[in-house]
Amino acid sequence: MDQKFDEFIAQTESEAEIDTSSRYTTGSISPQFASPTKFKNVLPHETDTQTGQRNRVAEHQHVPKSLLNASVEESHNHPLKEDKSESRQRQVSVSNSNPSSKGMVNKRRSLIQPMMVPTTPETDRTRPQSQSNVASGNSANKNNLHPDTNHGIDINATTQTPSSMSMGNPKFSENFASLAPSSKRNSMHSRTSSSQSMAIDSSLGGSMDVNALLQSLANKELELLECKRKIDDLKKQLHMEENIYQNKANELQELKNKVSKNINVSGSNQPVFNKTSTTGRKNSRESSRRNTHVTPVKTTRNDIRQDTSLNQDMENTDDNKQSMWSKPLALFNQVDQIIQQELERTLNWDEPPTPVEETEENQEGDKSVSKSLWSFVSDLKTGLLGIEEEEDGHHTQQSNSNVNRPKNTHGQVMDNRKHANEDINLSIKEFKTTKKHLDDNSDTHLKQRSGRTAVRKTKSGNKLNFVDDSDDGDSTLEADMVEMGSFSR
C-alpha cells in the first residue's frame, strides 16, 4: 500500500515538475506585510508521538508551484542547481536498491515547510544557547517518530552533506563557499525557531500560571476582608447586647430597692401596732382576773374598739408614706392580728410562754382563772334552767287559777310578760323584779291552803321565792321574784 502511494506521489511530481526530495535549504520568502518586522523560517518541532498518523498524511501535501518557483528564483546560488542530473541518478539508484526508500526520503523531505515567525532581540540573544539542544532534539524526534518506515536505510547516507558533495564536484565547492554564510544563517534560523516557539509557549504558560496565582490571591484577600467585616459586625452586635443587658440589670436593681423600701416602711409600722395590741392584751387579762363574771365582755369590746381606732389612726398618719404595695400588706397584717387576738382570747393564750422553772406558778394562776370561768358558765346554765322551771311553775299556777280568774287579769299578765321580755332584750344585764298582786279569787284559793307554809328553794342561787304567812291565817301573799336576765347580744 505504501509503495503504491509513493509511486503515485513520484508520478504526480514528475508530471507537475515538482521536486520535493532534494531540498536542503529553504528560500527566503519575503512576506508582504505592512509592518516592517523581520520574519524568519522555522522548522516545526514535533514532539507528540500520538500524532504520527496525522503527520504521515500531512507529509504528502503538495507545495504550490508558484511558491516553489519564487523560492528557487530568489535563491540564485542553490547547491543543487547544477547537479540535477546527479541527484536524479542518485534517486534512481536508491529506488532500485530499495523500493520503499524513495517514499521514505520524499516523506522525510516533504516535512520541511517554510514558516514565518517575527524576530525580536530576545530571540537573538537566546539563539546561541538553544542551537545544540534544538538540533539534537530535532534529529532524535525525526528518527523516533516513524521507526517502522526506515527499513534499515540510514537517511544520512541517502542525503549528501555539503562536504561530500563538494568533494565529488569542484564547482559545488565554490558555490557552497559563497553560500555558506547564508545557509548557516538559514539553519540557525530553522533551529532557533523551535526553541523560540518553546520559549513562547513556556512564557505563555508561566504568564497563565502567574495570572491564576494572582487571581487566587485576590480572591483570598477578598474572603479575608469579608470575614473581618463579619467579625466587626458581630463585635458591634455583642457590644449592643451587653449594653441592653446592663440597662435591664440596673432597672431590676432599682425595682428591688423600691420593693425593699416599701416593705421596710410597712415593717416599721408593725411594731407600733404590736405594742398597742400587747398593752390591750395585758389590760384585758388583768380585767378578766378581777371581774371574771361580767367584765370580760366589756373589756373585749373595748379592746376591739381600741384596736380599730389605732388602726384608723395609723392609716390616717401613714397615708402619705404608704404605696400601692404597702396597703394590701397592711390589710393582711390587720386581718391576721384580729384573728390571732380572737384565738388567743378564746384559748387563753394571753400570756407568753415561760421557762420550765415557772410552770408551777403559772399553772396555779391558770387553775384559778379556769375555775372562775367554769363557775361563770355554770351560773349561766343554772340561770337559764331556773327561768325555765319558773315558767313551768307559773304555767301550772295559771292553769289552776284560769278557771276563776277574770279575763282582764290574764291580759294584764300577758302584757307584763311582754314588757319584761322587751326590757331583757334592751339591757345587757338586768335584774328583773315582778310583783304579782293576786285578786280576790286567788286569795280565796290560797286561804283554802292555809296552815301550810312552803318555802321553795330552787337549784339556782340567784332565784328565791319568799312566802309570808300571818299568825292569824288571814294574810296576803306577795311573791317577789328575783331573776337574772340572759345576756342580750
From Swiss-Prot:
Q: Where in the cell is it found?
A: Cytoplasm
Where composition is biased (Acidic residues), the residues are 468-477
Cite the record's Basic residues compositional bias ranges. 447-460
**Which residue ranges have biased composition labelled Low complexity?**
182-197
Q: Where is the composition biased (Basic and acidic residues)?
A: 73-89
- Keywords of this entry: Coiled coil, Cytoplasm
Q: In which residue ranges is the amino acid composition biased (Polar residues)? A: 19-35, 90-103, 128-147, 156-167, 263-281, 396-411
GO CC annotations, alphabetized: cytoplasm
Instruction: Indicate whether Nucleotide-binding appears among the record's keywords.
Output: no
Cite a single Pfam family from the UniProt record. TDA11
The residues forming a coiled coil are 210-266
Superkingdom per UniProt: Eukaryota
Task: Give the start-end ranges of region Disordered.
Answer: 1-199, 263-321, 344-370, 391-413, 439-477
Similarity-based family: Belongs to the TDA11 family.
This chain's protein is named: Topoisomerase I damage affected protein 11
Per the UniProt record, the source organism is Candida glabrata (strain ATCC 2001 / BCRC 20586 / JCM 3761 / NBRC 0622 / NRRL Y-65 / CBS 138)
Lineage summary = Eukaryota, Fungi, Dikarya, Ascomycota, Saccharomycotina
